[in-house]
Amino acid sequence: MVEVLRSSTFLLLRNWEFTLAWIVFFTIPLVITPLPYVGFLAFFFILLFFNSTTQYFVKVLSKNEKSLEIKEIFKIKKPVFSFSLGESVYLFFTALLYYLFTKFYAVLFFWWWFYKPFLEKELYYARTFEDGFKALLILLLRPNWKYIKLGLRWSFIGLVLLTIAVLLVLSIAGVLLASFVVLLLSVVLAHFTAETILRIKTLA
């Protein structure tokens, strides 16, 4: 476990963008306001819920189960936890940096539309805490561009759902229901992400 964290840290620090984001995150916000840390925690828990839901739907769809046990979603497995932790750190820091360069939306578009379903595919095989980190790193180091076409259907549906969610959040009712909308959106997107994963032939 220590070796995985050490190698992962050295890998990320060699990326100047990540290093700069790390410096910005731990200096400026600490002096001005702790809100970015609160945002990071919220980001982590949203990803944790999403990843757990996705993995559950993959299991249900692959086994053609007729009934759903929603409580299983909240039984967070070790690889899902470590995967979500690594993902939230990497994505939050990267998004923070790109936000400074007005590229925030481009980062989210690339990550959620094309990368996310296939990182989830790798997570499907994970069984230990250490495997969760490996699942995150494998496609960051070796992206497979042929999978992009498989994510187009998921991307279109996700775009529609996100648009609806934004409109709700911008409305008066949306402000009151923002948390509910985020959870509902996570469940729906997780279902379609699971369908995308099952379309990938390498998932036996």
From Swiss-Prot:
Main location: membrane
Tree of life domain: Bacteria
Alphabetical keyword list: Cell membrane, Membrane, Transmembrane, Transmembrane helix
Transmembrane segments: 21-50, 92-114, 150-172, 176-198
Cellular localisation: Cell membrane
Keyword flag Repressor: no
Topology versus the membrane: Multi-pass membrane protein
Cellular component terms (Gene Ontology): plasma membrane
Name the UniProt record assigns to this protein: Uncharacterized protein aq_577
Species, as recorded: Aquifex aeolicus (strain VF5)
